[in-house]
């Protein structure tokens, strides 16, 4: 593990792409980027660290005490001593009123006090460093860094540590992607979404503490088997639709659903990873062009406004690829792929069953408003007949969405 740790600590020498898929947008997407904060100024790096604003609370209390003491030491006491009612009513009452709110405040809300202490303790615990982990074998390599199997020394918890190099992120100008991944993925809680436990950074690297998916990427499984059967495809589509439904309820659009960004947990359950291209859109409308070429919908290629329906299109492309072994609009050139997508030109081989053809055809509509909702996808007869998710996953999915 020491050798792997040295490799993790050493600076970037070569950038190796995570996958060799030919149909990618020129902008690199395998690893999201980091805040535009990093090497240029040391102060800006503090953006990635946990907030330290809670440390200022006691300083405010000290200011109240410092204001009260000079009031008590004013030379008004001798004249007030002669007149008994004045010193008794005003100065003591003011000091008592000012001193009393401080002790009772925490006493009146003990639960809030305990909760704030717990949050402070958690924030301190989340100030991770590389020395807190034992670094194991590499799990994957990408253009901006690597992913390693790791173990937290104190708890012995197994996780995945994604190491990204700041210099390469800044050179590519994709720092905003890392900010998206941290801001979005850290707040998502769903059994079919990969957890982001925390993050930290040093002078040259950014580290993401991620949930470990022991069965690897769906893309590798698809390469081994060439294609999936109906049951496995329908099960994956069900789990993916549940996860996307949760994301959309949080006003999060993923925009880059593809086999490389889907991992498998210990029980074989599907987990969405890599939220670098995702976006939390209060307006739910985006015009930027991003995502993997084969999965881009017509509205994004044509530069039109788009919403969460882009994920429905990707779901149809993914269902087709699972059953056939390749995307429906795959072509020899980018120009031909763009043309096929904009015209929605694709054909079904004989191996695709009729029920799956109906679902895919409904999802791959040029007009986004004509695509079914995720609820309608889950209620599709072919999905119901072939999907075999575990009862445990169903309970977790419904509890997370409620």
UniProtKB/Swiss-Prot annotation:
Keywords: ATP-binding, Cell cycle, Cell division, Cell membrane, Cell projection, Cilium, Cilium biogenesis/degradation, Cytoplasm, Cytoskeleton, Isopeptide bond, Kinase, Membrane, Microtubule, Mitosis, Nucleotide-binding, Phosphoprotein, Proto-oncogene, Serine/threonine-protein kinase, Transferase, Ubl conjugation. GO terms for biological process: cell division; cilium disassembly; meiotic spindle organization; mitotic centrosome separation; mitotic spindle organization; positive regulation of mitotic cell cycle; regulation of cytokinesis. It comes from the Eukaryota. SUPFAM superfamilies: Protein kinase-like (PK-like) (SSF56112). ATP binds at residues 143, 162, 210-213, 260-261, 274. Its EC number is 2.7.11.1. InterPro entries: Aur-like (IPR030616), AURKA (IPR030611), Kinase-like_dom_sf (IPR011009), Prot_kinase_dom (IPR000719), Protein_kinase_ATP_BS (IPR017441), Ser/Thr_kinase_AS (IPR008271). It is an enzyme of class 2 (transferase). Activated by phosphorylation at Thr-288; this brings about a change in the conformation of the activation segment. Phosphorylation at Thr-288 varies during the cell cycle and is highest during M phase. Autophosphorylated at Thr-288 upon TPX2 binding. Thr-288 can be phosphorylated by several kinases, including PAK and PKA. Protein phosphatase type 1 (PP1) binds AURKA and inhibits its activity by dephosphorylating Thr-288 during mitosis. Phosphorylation at Ser-342 decreases the kinase activity. The modification Phosphoserine is found at residues 41, 342. Residues 280-293 are annotated as: Activation segment. It catalyses: L-seryl-[protein] + ATP = O-phospho-L-seryl-[protein] + ADP + H(+); L-threonyl-[protein] + ATP = O-phospho-L-threonyl-[protein] + ADP + H(+). Its main location: cytoplasm. GO terms for cellular component: basolateral plasma membrane; centriole; centrosome; chromosome passenger complex; ciliary basal body; contractile ring; cytoplasm; kinetochore. Residues 133-383 form the Protein kinase domain. Residues 30-75, 91-100 have a biased composition (Polar residues). The active site is at residue 256. Belongs to the protein kinase superfamily. Ser/Thr protein kinase family. Aurora subfamily. Mitotic serine/threonine kinase that contributes to the regulation of cell cycle progression. Associates with the centrosome and the spindle microtubules during mitosis and plays a critical role in various mitotic events including the establishment of mitotic spindle, centrosome duplication, centrosome separation as well as maturation, chromosomal alignment, spindle assembly checkpoint, and cytokinesis. Required for normal spindle positioning during mitosis and for the localization of NUMA1 and DCTN1 to the cell cortex during metaphase. Required for initial activation of CDK1 at centrosomes. This is Aurora kinase A. It comes from Bos taurus.
């Amino acid at each position: 593990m020491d050798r792997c740790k040295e490799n993790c600590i050493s600076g970037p020498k070569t950038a190796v792409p995570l996958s060799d898929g030919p149909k990618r947008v020129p902008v690199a997407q395998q690893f999201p980027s980091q805040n535009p904060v990093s090497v240029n100024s040391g102060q800006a790096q503090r953006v990635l660290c946990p907030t330290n604003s809670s440390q200022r609370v006691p300083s405010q209390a000290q200011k109240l005490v410092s204001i009260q003491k000079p009031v008590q030491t004013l030379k008004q006491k001798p004249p007030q001593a002669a007149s008994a009612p004045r010193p008794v009513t005003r100065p003591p009452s003011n000091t008592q009123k000012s001193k009393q709110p401080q002790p009772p405040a925490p006493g009146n809300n003990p639960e809030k006090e305990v909760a704030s202490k717990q949050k402070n303790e958690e924030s301190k615990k989340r100030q991770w460093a590389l020395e807190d982990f034992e670094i194991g074998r590499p799990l994957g390599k990408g253009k901006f860094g690597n992913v390693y199997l790791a173990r937290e020394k104190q708890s012995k918890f197994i996780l995945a540590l994604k190491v990204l190099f700041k210099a390469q992120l800044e050179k590519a100008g994709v720092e905003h992607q890392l900010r998206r991944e941290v801001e979005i993925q850290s707040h998502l809680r769903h059994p079919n979404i990969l957890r982001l436990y925390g993050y930290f950074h040093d002078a040259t690297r950014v580290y993401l503490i991620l949930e470990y998916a022991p069965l690897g990427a769906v893309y590798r499984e698809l390469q081994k088997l060439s294609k999936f059967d109906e049951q496995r495809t329908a099960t994956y589509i069900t789990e993916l639709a549940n996860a996307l439904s949760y994301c959309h309820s949080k006003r999060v659009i993923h925009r880059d659903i593809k086999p490389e960004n889907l991992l498998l947990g210990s029980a074989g359950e599907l987990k969405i990873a890599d939220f670098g291209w995702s976006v939390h859109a209060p307006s739910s409308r985006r015009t930027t062009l991003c995502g993997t070429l084969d999965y881009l919908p017509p509205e994004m290629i044509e530069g039109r406004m788009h919403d969460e329906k882009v994920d429905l299109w990707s779901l149809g492309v993914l269902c087709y690829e699972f059953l056939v072994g390749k995307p429906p609009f795959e072509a020899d050139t980018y120009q031909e792929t763009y043309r096929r997508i904009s015209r929605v030109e694709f054909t079904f081989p004989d191996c695709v069953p009729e029920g799956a053809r109906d679902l895919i055809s409904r999802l791959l509509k040029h007009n986004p408003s004509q695509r079914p909702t995720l609820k309608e996808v889950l209620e599709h007869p072919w999905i119901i007949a072939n999907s075999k998710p575990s009862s445990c996953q169903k309970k977790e999915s419904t509890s997370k969405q409620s």
